C-alpha cells in the first residue's frame, strides 16, 4: 500500500521500520474533542492533573554540574506570559518563540507524547542504551511529561528538564528538576561530560542553529553516552493522489516560509540532521522513520489507532502552529488564519485523502574515547 514518496519509502506505523545506521566506519568512505480515545488528557497520560505553575528555581550541583540559575530572566519571572491573538505566550525573549504556552498548548504537547509511544509500538521512554541510575537531560521539556515519566520509571536516576516556558508542574518526583526560562540555544554549562542521555523532542520550528546545538549536546554527554531526538516532518505526503491545490499543502508551504523567514524553520531534513550530527562528532547514528496517517483510513487496527491519535494531535496543532508565524511574519488577520486552519482540519478529517507525515527518530553516540 505504501509507495515511494518524495523522500523515499513511506513506512507504516504498525511495523517496526528498518533503521538507517551511520557508523563511524562509513564516515571515512479547543479543548472540545470528538475523539473518544482521548477525552481525558490525564487518563491517557496516566498521571494526575498537575498544578500548572512554574517549578522552583533551586540551584543544583551534582557530579560537578554547576548551577543554571544565572540564565533566568528576572523580568520574565515577574511577567512570565503575555496574550497575543487570544493565546498566551511566554515573555522570555518576547516574540522569538512561535508557539503558545497556555492550557490548550500544554494539552497538545501531552497528546504528542502519547502519540509517540503508540506510533513506536513500545512503552519505552528511551531507546538508546542507558543506565537505570543515570543522569538524563530533557531539552525543551514542555510540560515535563517525558522527564516526569522517566523519573518515575527510574527512581535512582537524576532527571532535569529545561524549557523557555515555566509550565512544568510543581508536583514532580524528587529525582526530577525543572529550570525555566532556559534557552538551550544560548551558551549553557550544565556539567560537560556528565550526562548519560540527552533527549530532545519536536525542536523543529524553535531552533536557529542546529550545528551549534549539537556541539553543545556532544560536549555535555559522557564519553560513550547517547543523544536521542524525535521530530515530525510536517510536509504532507500521499502515495495515491497529488496534494497540489489542497489547503493542507498550501498551509505547509506558508508555514515553511514563515518559519524560515523567522530563522527558526519548522521543515525537517534528515540528511542535514545526520550530517550535522556527524560533524559534531557523533558516531553510530541510527535513524528510524515511522508513518503518521492524518486520519484512520487504513484497515489495519494499529495503523488506525496511530491515525486517531495523530488526527487529534494535528487538530490541536494547526492553529497553534499557524497563529504567530502568519500574524507576525505575514501580517495576516485572525479571520484569515482561522479560515485556512479550518480548511486544513477539514481535509485532515477526510478519509478520502490518504495523507501522512513522517516521524523521525535519531540516536547518536558520543565516542567512548
Swiss-Prot record:
Residues 20-37 have a biased composition (Low complexity). Component of the heterotrimeric velvet complex composed of laeA, veA and velB; VeA acting as a bridging protein between laeA and velB. Interacts directly with veA. The keyword Nucleus applies. This is Secondary metabolism regulator laeA. It catalyses: L-methionyl-[protein] + S-adenosyl-L-methionine = S-methyl-L-methionyl-[protein] + S-adenosyl-L-homocysteine. Residues 1-37 are annotated as: Disordered. Methyltransferase that performs automethylation. No other methyl-accepting substrate has been identified yet. Component of the velvet transcription factor complex that acts as a global regulator for secondary metabolite gene expression. Required for aflR expression and subsequent aflatoxin production. Negatively regulates veA expression. Controls conidiophore and conidial development. Required for hydrophobin production which plays a role in cell surface hydrophobicity and host defense escape. Pfam families: Methyltransf_23. The gene is laeA. It is an enzyme of class 2 (transferase). The keyword Transcription regulation applies. It comes from Aspergillus flavus (strain ATCC 200026 / FGSC A1120 / IAM 13836 / NRRL 3357 / JCM 12722 / SRRC 167). One of its GO terms (biological process) is sporulation resulting in formation of a cellular spore. CDD domains: AdoMet_MTases (cd02440). Keywords: Methyltransferase, Nucleus, S-adenosyl-L-methionine, Sporulation, Transcription, Transcription regulation, Transferase, Virulence. GO terms for molecular function: methyltransferase activity. Belongs to the methyltransferase superfamily. LaeA methyltransferase family.
Amino acid at each position: 500500500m505504501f509507495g515511494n514518496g518524495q523522500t523515499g519509502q513511506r513506512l507504516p506505523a504498525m511495523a517496526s521500520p528498518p533503521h538507517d545506521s551511520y557508523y563511524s566506519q562509513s564516515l571515512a568512505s479547543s479543548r472540545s474533542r470528538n475523539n473518544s480515545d482521548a477525552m481525558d488528557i490525564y487518563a491517557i497520560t496516566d498521571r494526575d492533573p498537575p498544578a500548572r505553575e512554574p517549578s522552583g528555581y533551586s540551584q543544583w550541583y551534582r557530579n560537578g554540574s554547576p548551577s543554571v540559575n544565572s540564565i533566568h530572566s528576572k523580568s520574565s519571572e515577574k511577567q512570565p506570559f503575555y496574550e497575543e491573538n487570544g493565546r498566551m505566550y511566554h515573555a522570555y525573549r518576547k516574540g522569538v518563540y512561535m508557539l503558545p504556552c497556555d492550557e490548550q498548548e500544554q494539552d497538545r504537547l501531552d497528546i504528542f507524547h502519547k502519540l509517540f509511544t503508540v506510533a513506536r509500538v513500545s512503552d519505552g521512554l528511551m531507546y538508546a542504551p542507558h543506565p537505570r541510575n543515570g543522569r538524563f537531560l530533557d531539552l525543551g521539556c514542555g510540560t515535563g511529561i517525558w522527564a516526569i515519566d522517566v523519573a518515575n520509571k527510574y527512581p535512582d536516576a537524576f532527571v532535569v528538564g529545561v524549557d523557555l516556558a515555566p509550565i512544568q508542574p510543581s508536583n514532580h518526583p524528587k529525582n526530577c528538576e525543572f529550570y525555566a526560562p532556559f534557552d538551550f540555544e544560548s551558551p549553557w554549562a550544565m556539567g560537560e561530560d556528565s550526562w548519560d542521555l540527552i533527549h530532545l523532542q519536536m525542536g523543529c520550528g524553535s531552533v536557529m542553529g542546529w550545528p551549534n546545538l549539537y556541539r553543545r549536546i556532544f560536549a555535555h554527554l559522557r564519553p560513550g553516552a547517547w543523544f536521542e531526538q524525535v521530530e515530525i516532518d510536517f510536509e504532507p505526503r500521499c502515495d495515491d493522489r497529488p496534494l497540489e491545490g489542497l489547503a493542507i499543502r498550501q498551509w505547509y508551504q506558508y508555514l515553511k516560509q514563515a518559519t524560515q523567514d523567522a530563522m527558526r524553520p519548522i521543515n525537517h531534513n534528515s540528511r542535514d540532521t545526520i550530517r550535522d550530527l556527524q560533524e559534531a562528532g557523533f558516531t553510530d547514528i541510527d535513524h528510524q522513520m515511522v508513518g503518521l496517517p492524518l486520519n484512520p483510513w487504513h484497515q489495519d487496527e494499529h495503523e488506525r489507532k496511530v491515525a486517531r491519535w495523530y488526527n487529534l494531535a494535528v487538530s490541536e496543532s494547526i492553529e497553534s502552529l499557524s497563529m504567530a508565524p502568519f500574524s507576525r511574519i505575514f501580517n495576516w488577520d485572525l479571520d484569515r488564519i482561522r479560515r485556512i486552519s479550518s480548511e486544513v482540519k477539514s481535509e485532515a478529517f477526510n478519509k478520502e485523502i490518504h495523507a501522512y507525515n513522517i516521524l523521525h527518530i535519531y540516536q547518536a553516540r558520543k565516542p567512548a574515547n
